[in-house]
Amino acid sequence: MSIKVLIVDDSAVVRQVLSQVFTAASGIEVMDVANDPYMAMDKMKARWPDVIVLDVEMPRMDGITFLKQLMASRPTPVVICSSLTQKGTDISMQAMAAGAVEVIAKPVSGVKGFLEESSHELVMAVRSAAAARMNRVRVMPSASGNPLETRPKLSADAILSAPTGSNVFATTERIIAIGTSTGGTQALEAVLTQLPRTCPGLAIVQHMPEKFTRSFADRLNSLSQIEVKEADNGDRILPGRALIAPGGKHMMVKRSGAYYQVEVVDGPLVSRHKPSVDVLFRSAAKFAGKNALGIIMTGMGDDGAKGLKEMHDCGAKTIAQDEESCVVFGMPKEAIKLGAADEVMPLELIAKAICR
């Protein structure tokens, strides 16, 4: 059965481009379009969508207000479609905290360029959103021959060779590597806001487009006791600090003398993502070994499953979020199937596991 999508955006060009992308994808039906939330609500009286693609800055009623009303009355998967301005990315993070499950960037490179560059990400965002279990979404407090289907799926080999065990140096310093996707913004907020300043350093991959991760990190930093920042190349992984991989870049853990740091690099999509959880986890396996803890959380697909198994095989402790607390039980499920997880636990216990 097709995923029914309602597009809500005040730009006719954006509505047209998004409609074109989704119509070309197998298994997705553009149910209708609306130029503001009032029109959307009228259309939803006759037929309810499976996924709503929502702009955040619109006249008459903004997307955040509409989203909050929707989550209070009939929770429905929402994909935020936002501009790459600072204001746009900040508002998008408010929307994710209010219950949206995915965020995508608005067309900026012209219709032709946008269709070539971003169609895959748009379609994957809608499919991930459609798989979301809305009763697991946490509304956080404020402070077919189609080329989309045939894109080659590269492994972490495209970025980093597999661990051999010979690269791991003895050290007492622990690091935490976390990977997550759909539902992860709320899940990470739930975990990071519980951590004390004395917790081990964290390196985190959350699937998110370029430009949005800085606003996401800034929001978490304002809510947490620990420091949370978008990673820059060469940043040290320190106790009480969480580094979030920039959207559109891969992030790896590297050993540098007596401490760990991150390397932020460009490269191809790995496991169909950039940043890729598999790349982060492989680097943690290779350079931290048993000194690392790997955690795979809510998200669609299998990115991170193989990498977590590599961490496990190199002596790291590994955790998968349980099905009951996941918004989408995809990535953890695949990791569990591979035998990659030492423990399977609910979201509310993960912060304690990090600190024990």
From Swiss-Prot:
Question: What region holds the CheB-type methylesterase domain?
Answer: 169-356
The entry's function note states: Involved in chemotaxis. Part of a chemotaxis signal transduction system that modulates chemotaxis in response to various stimuli. Catalyzes the demethylation of specific methylglutamate residues introduced into the chemoreceptors (methyl-accepting chemotaxis proteins or MCP) by CheR. Also mediates the irreversible deamidation of specific glutamine residues to glutamic acid.
Q: Where in the cell is it found?
A: Cytoplasm
* Pfam families named among the record's database cross-references: CheB_methylest (PF01339), Response_reg (PF00072)
GO biological process terms, alphabetically, are: chemotaxis
Stored PROSITE patterns: CHEB, RESPONSE_REGULATORY
Q: Does the keyword Endoplasmic reticulum apply?
A: no
Active site per UniProt:
181, 207, 303
Q: Which gene encodes it?
A: cheB2
Gene3D superfamilies listed in its UniProt record? 3.40.50.2300, Methylesterase CheB, C-terminal domain (3.40.50.180)
Q: Which UniProt keywords apply?
A: Chemotaxis, Cytoplasm, Hydrolase, Phosphoprotein
PTM remark = Phosphorylated by CheA. Phosphorylation of the N-terminal regulatory domain activates the methylesterase activity.
Q: Which GO terms describe its molecular function?
A: phosphorelay response regulator activity; protein-glutamate methylesterase activity; protein-glutamine glutaminase activity
Q: What is this protein called?
A: Protein-glutamate methylesterase/protein-glutamine glutaminase 2
For the modification 4-aspartylphosphate, which residues carry it? 55
Chief subcellular site?
cytoplasm
Q: Name one GO cellular component term.
A: cytoplasm
Q: Which residues form the Response regulatory domain?
A: 4-121
Catalyses which reaction? Answer: [protein]-L-glutamate 5-O-methyl ester + H2O = L-glutamyl-[protein] + methanol + H(+); L-glutaminyl-[protein] + H2O = L-glutamyl-[protein] + NH4(+)
